UniProtKB/Swiss-Prot annotation:
Known EC number: 3.4.24.-
Ranges per topology, Forespore intermembrane space: 31, 106-126, 179
Presence of the UniProt keyword Nucleotide-binding in the record: no
Miscellaneous comment: Could be held inactive when BofA provides a fourth zinc ligand, preventing access to a water molecule and the sequence of pro sigma-K.
Catalytic center residues: 44
Cofactor-binding details, from the entry: Binds 1 zinc ion per subunit.
Cellular component terms per the entry's GO annotation: membrane
Organism annotation: Bacillus subtilis (strain 168)
Chief location of this protein within or outside the cell: membrane
UniProt name for this protein: Stage IV sporulation protein FB
Length: 288
């Protein structure tokens, strides 16, 4: 029970949202604002509830004027199926919300105009969230797809590039189709800034992924995936090949012949504990 109470206490509202709420009250648009807030809140609680169920470490649930976000202390080492469930839990809330609104309209609890307004916001938020742009749900699902096929670092970089392409397409669509829609411009700017910040933090994000592997926190490895590397390969370049959901026995070859084999933890220990950041794999085999 305490973890659910803690979740409620972690809900934070952006100050700008309070300003929007005040303007909505003054201009008589409270019904639209309440519909929007309800949909956003339920959507984010869908993510958060599954995260709590899987014992993720939640920092806060942050509600913005045009959406929300669940900030977690997880760095890419949860099972892919588990993360998929947490991501998809948000969009799934829109299904029962729409059905509930339809039922209320059918029994005349809410007016038809209110139902149409709710439907517009519900579908708009759903479709926007499924755009393949980081940090939207669609962008996170795309990252999972890339992570299943590629090493974490390559998947993250490809996701940023793909998200940037779709973000630019979104910007062009806003510019040429709905240039007077302020909310669309706010969304575009938010996504552009989020992508820029994610790009700036890309090295730090990879290091956190590696650190979590090193300390073995919350890891449920699905399979062993050997990595064959050259003796002269640097430690950091080898770690750039680490994939999610896998533990890597590292086979070191020299002149086409197997020289030795290391566990990934030995490589991580050499990098983080021994600070052998510029060592080659062959040098790791020598006494330190």
């Amino acid at each position: 029970m305490n973890k659910w109470l803690d979740l409620i206490l972690k809900i934070h509202v952006h100050p700008f949202l309070w300003i929007i709420a005040a303007l909505g009250l003054l201009t008589g648009h409270m019904k639209a604002l309440l519909c929007l807030l309800l949909i956003v809140l339920i959507h984010e609680l869908g993510h958060a509830a599954l995260a709590v169920f899987f014992s993720w470490r939640i920092k806060r649930v942050f509600l913005l004027p045009f959406g929300g976000t669940v900030e977690v202390e997880e760095h890419g080492n949860r099972p892919l199926k588990e993360e998929f469930a947490v991501i998809i839990a948000g969009p799934l809330q829109h299904i029962w919300l729409q059905f509930a609104a339809w039922m209320l309209a059918e029994v005349s609890v809410i007016h038809q105009h209110t139902f149409e307004l709710f439907t517009f916001y519900n579908l708009s938020i759903l479709f926007v969230n499924l755009l393949p742009i980081w940090p939207l749900d669609g962008g996170k699902l795309l990252f999972l797809l890339f992570s299943k096929q590629l090493p974490f670092q390559k998947a993250h970089r490809l996701n940023l590039k793909t998200s940037l392409c779709f973000c630019l397409l979104l910007g062009c669509w806003v510019l040429f189709v709905i240039p007077l829609q302020i909310s669309a411009w706010v969304l575009f700017v938010f996504l552009a800034v989020s992508l820029f910040e994610e790009y700036r933090q890309r090295h730090y994000i990879h290091v956190r992924f590696l650190l979590e592997r090193y300390y073995g926190k919350n890891r449920e490895l699905e399979k062993l995936l050997p990595l064959t590397v050259k003796a002269e390969d640097k430690v950091y370049h080898v770690m750039a090949e680490f994939k999610r959901g896998c533990k890597h026995p590292i086979i070191i070859e020299k002149s086409g012949q197997k020289l030795s084999q290391l566990d990934e933890n030995e490589v991580l220990h050499a990098y983080f504990a021994d600070k052998r950041t510029n060592s080659s794999m062959e040098e790791l085999l020598l006494p330190y």
